[in-house]
Amino acid sequence: MLKQIFAAIILALFYPDASWLNELTSMDHMVEYNKINLSQVGADPEVVKDNATWPLTPTSRTDSGIELPLATFDTKPTHVTNVEELETSYDMCQSVVAQHAAALRTKAMLSAAYNIAPASNSAATPVLPTTGNDRGDGNKALTYADLLTLRTKFNKANYPQTGRVIVLCPEHEEDLLKEDAARYNQIMTTGQVAGFKVYVTNHGVQYSTSGTKQAYGTTNAQPCSFAFCKEEVMRAMGTIDGEPEKRWADYRGWLLGFQMRFVAMPFRNKGIAAIYSKNA
């Protein structure tokens, strides 16, 4: 029973209302044994206008199946002593669980951001450089014009006008605020810019100076903001395991730690984009 209770607490705290992870298409119902089976849909059919030749030549559609194991996220256990639990004026175990939920959420968010940001520039996955003036750190600032360029790329790719999301990095949020504070404040009020719903988070994805996504965890390259169409990205939650383990003989208290299975990624290499800070 404790296992189910603590798993429910972790899950309830994992998707706060302000999190951009809520924008991803939930595929929880497709998870089985901590794996998810997806199909990448084949090419769209050709449309012929005012056809005069019958019958039309049929074409086959080839779909590709993908079996995807969910990533495993483990928190290192926290030791709560019997004395601490008795002498604190709050439920220390519940506080520790909330802390583990926040840590899991942060790590899963970083993984999701890295998976969603495209590897390099293409018509279906635009990766654009910033074009503003030197922001003082040797990089060009993000401008509102850059966001309009991204909008045009999405429009030319015929992506839906609804369900577009952009996740700004802190540097790019600062750039927009400096360029036009009143306009920025209006964006934060409406939550929209250039047709994109706006979020801001320190997601850590970085690119090279030529626009190639760098390895996960890179910290010395170019920061970026990334964007996506909601219908083109997914998230899936698997099992959440963990409960307080009483360890009286050696720890005089409890150990709390959790394991969560989760993945977030694009359905296909389409409908995702990034804007990276270009060298000035």
Regions found by a protein language model. Give the residues of each.
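Alpha-helical scaffold segments that mediate packing/assembly in large oligomeric complexes
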Residues: V83-K156, A274-A280
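Extended oligomerization regions of viral-like shell subunits
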Residues: E32, I36-N37, L148, T152-G238
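Long, hydrophobic/aromatic-enriched structural stretches that serve as scaffold segments
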Residues: T59-A98
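A structured, mid-to-C-terminal "fold-capping" secondary-structure block
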Residues: P223-L255, Q259
